[in-house]
């Protein structure tokens, strides 16, 4: 019964670009995504995502205020 409201306050976003991998073992993927609903509809954010993701996937974001820091490209 509680599982029905898992995404009650989450907002859908579509992955429009996979930027690269981050994290010690590369387990986090940095993506550019477009917000599909809520007060920030149409806004493009850079976020870090855990798990497999590709362009066109829909991800659920708990909040749309923060953006991920750019990847360090020094290496």
UniProtKB/Swiss-Prot annotation:
It holds the Pfam family Ribosomal_S28e. One of its GO terms (biological process) is ribosomal small subunit assembly. Keywords: Ribonucleoprotein, Ribosomal protein. One of its GO terms (cellular component) is cytosolic small ribosomal subunit. The keyword Ribonucleoprotein applies. SUPFAM superfamilies: Nucleic acid-binding proteins. PROSITE patterns: RIBOSOMAL_S28E. It comes from the Archaea. The keyword DNA damage does not apply. One of its GO terms (molecular function) is structural constituent of ribosome. Belongs to the eukaryotic ribosomal protein eS28 family. NCBIfam families: PRK04007.1 (NF003080). This is Small ribosomal subunit protein eS28. The lineage of its organism: Archaea, Methanobacteriati, Methanobacteriota, Methanomada group, Methanococci.
């Amino acid at each position: 019964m509680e599982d029905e409201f898992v995404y009650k306050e989450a907002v859908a976003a579509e992955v429009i670009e996979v930027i690269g991998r981050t994290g010690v073992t590369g387990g986090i993927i940095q993506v550019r995504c477009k917000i599909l609903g809520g007060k920030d509809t149409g806004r493009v954010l850079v976020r870090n995502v855990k798990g497999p993701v590709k362009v066109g996937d829909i991800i659920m974001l708990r909040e749309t205020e923060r953006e991920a820091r750019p990847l360090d490209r020094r290496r």
